[in-house]
Amino acid sequence: MNPSRCRIIAIGKVRKSWVQDGIELYRKRLPGLTIVELRDSNPEKEAESIRQTLRRDEWPVMLMEQGETLTSINFSERLRSLGSQRLAFVIGGADGLTAELKALAHWKLSLSPMTFPHELARLLLIEQLFRAQAILQGSPYHRA
């Protein structure tokens, strides 16, 4: 997994300092990973902002409650199987993603069957990206 081939596109700003601290901790451990914050608005405007931000060479990975749930090991294997494909992990705002955006997904992913605030989902995702890299590199970080 190459962090420079991944972007996180998220609606809204992280307002809680402890969440931001966690995100920054993992961002430093994943050099090259980009996080794009888009302004929160109504779902249609958010969808338009996301569509405009997605690059043609990226596969959108939409994070949603109804997406595929994977173990950390399965997640790392999936990332490895995608090789050099550029990925854009998309986290919607408080109202989630529109049906139109969900239809653009190359992969629909759920971090859990539970619902989390979108800023916490960002922290969980970036930690799982770091964990996936650690698993693929044989690092002792993942000890399941």
From Swiss-Prot:
Main location: cytoplasm
Entry binding sites for S-adenosyl-L-methionine: G92, L111, S112, P113, M114, T115, F116
Binding partners and assembly: Homodimer.
Gene Ontology terms: cellular component: cytoplasm
Function: Specifically methylates the pseudouridine at position 1915 (m3Psi1915) in 23S rRNA.
Similarity section: Belongs to the RNA methyltransferase RlmH family.
Keywords, in A-Z order: Cytoplasm, Methyltransferase, rRNA processing, S-adenosyl-L-methionine, Transferase
Pfam families: SPOUT_MTase
Gene: rlmH
Substrates-to-products reaction catalysed: pseudouridine(1915) in 23S rRNA + S-adenosyl-L-methionine = N(3)-methylpseudouridine(1915) in 23S rRNA + S-adenosyl-L-homocysteine + H(+)
EC number: 2.1.1.177
Record Gene3D superfamilies: 3.40.1280.10
Source species: Synechococcus sp. (strain CC9311)
Main EC class the enzyme belongs to: transferase
Protein name: Ribosomal RNA large subunit methyltransferase H
Molecular function as annotated in GO: rRNA (pseudouridine-N3-)-methyltransferase activity
Record's subcellular location: Cytoplasm
